[in-house]
C-alpha cells in the first residue's frame, strides 16, 4: 500500500510539473528522509525547498489540492 501511494504521489508531482510548463520553472518531488520507512514521515519539495513535511496521506492531499486548483484556474 505504501509503495502504491508513493508511486501515485510521484506521478501526480510529474503531472503538476506538466501543468506548470514541464518543470522548466517549477519542480516538485517526494523525498524520503532518514528514517522515513520507520516513522512514516516524508518531505514534499517544491523548487528545492520543503513545502510539506508529513505522512504520505497528508502529502497526497496537498498534491491533489494543488493539481485541482491549477485545473480549476485553467477552466475559468
Where does each model-flagged region fall?
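A short, charged, amphipathic alpha-helix used as a generic interaction element across diverse proteins
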Residues: 5, 9-13, 43-45, 54-73
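Short N-terminal "domain-start" leader segments
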Residues: 1-41
Amino acid at each position: 500500500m505504501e509503495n502504491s501511494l508513493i508511486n501515485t504521489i510521484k506521478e501526480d508531482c510529474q503531472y503538476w510539473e506538466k501543468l506548470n510548463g514541464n518543470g522548466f520553472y517549477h519542480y516538485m518531488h517526494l523525498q524520503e528522509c532518514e528514517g522515513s520507512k520507520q516513522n512514516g514521515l516524508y518531505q514534499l519539495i517544491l523548487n528545492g525547498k520543503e513545502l510539506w513535511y508529513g505522512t504520505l496521506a497528508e502529502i497526497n492531499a496537498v498534491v491533489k489540492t494543488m493539481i485541482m486548483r491549477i485545473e480549476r484556474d485553467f477552466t475559468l
